[in-house]
Amino acid sequence: MLWVQRKRRRKETSECPSDKDKSPESHKAKNESWIKSHFSRLSEEKLALDNNASASGNATQTESGSEEVSSTVHIETFTTRHGEVGSALHRESFTSRQKTSGPSVIQEIHQESGKAPSTDEATWAAVAACTKEIDTQGRHLAHSMLQRAIAYQHSGHLESKDINQEELRALEEVEMKLQKNFLTQRENTIAGANHTHTFYGHSHHSHHGHPSHQSHSLPNRRH
């Protein structure tokens, strides 16, 4: 009887290691299956969160589309035409302003043309004379500097002692005169702004379709 019990114990002992050998593998398989399902669930949840975030971002961008955006383009030209007596100047100005606020677009076009005022003609004539004088003075100064450059043929450069200060001051005076004429012309242009044609356009980008409005306004103004 005792021998039989020992034999059974040995048999149970010999079977236990096999069960122990199987249990880690089964636990490992269960763990891997749980890990895969867990991370798969996390990935699905993250994907759903990303989709919700992108959708909310698009909604926010649509709502924030109501912010105003404006742009302005201004072009002004002075031209002379062949066949006219004297140096008559023609002034053309074009200004376009556009403001976008959500689905609404407001556009303003300002255009003017015609003969430039006599003050502009006098100013531009003075500018042309100064430009010609600068060219003449500059050429004369450069020529005299090269003539007086003692070491020019040997060194290839000029020194400060080779510059005639009187001619240099004369050139600077002409440049100052030209700058003054440009400033005068700019002040006259700003002060004597002449608004002749102004068009306003207002439109809505929607399904109901609001009509656009245009009006001619702002009569001539002179300061």
Curated annotation (Swiss-Prot):
Ranges of compositional bias, category Basic residues: 1-11, 202-223
Polar residues bias (residue ranges): 51-61
Protein name, entry field: Uncharacterized protein C10orf62
In-chain residues carrying the UniProt-annotated modification Phosphoserine: S43
A Pfam family recorded for this sequence: DUF5569
Domain of life: Eukaryota
Coiled coil: none
Keyword list, A-Z: Phosphoprotein
Bias-annotated ranges (Basic and acidic residues): 12-37
Annotated region (Disordered), positions in chain: 1-37, 49-73, 196-223
Ranges of compositional bias, category Low complexity: 62-73
Keyword Cell cycle: no
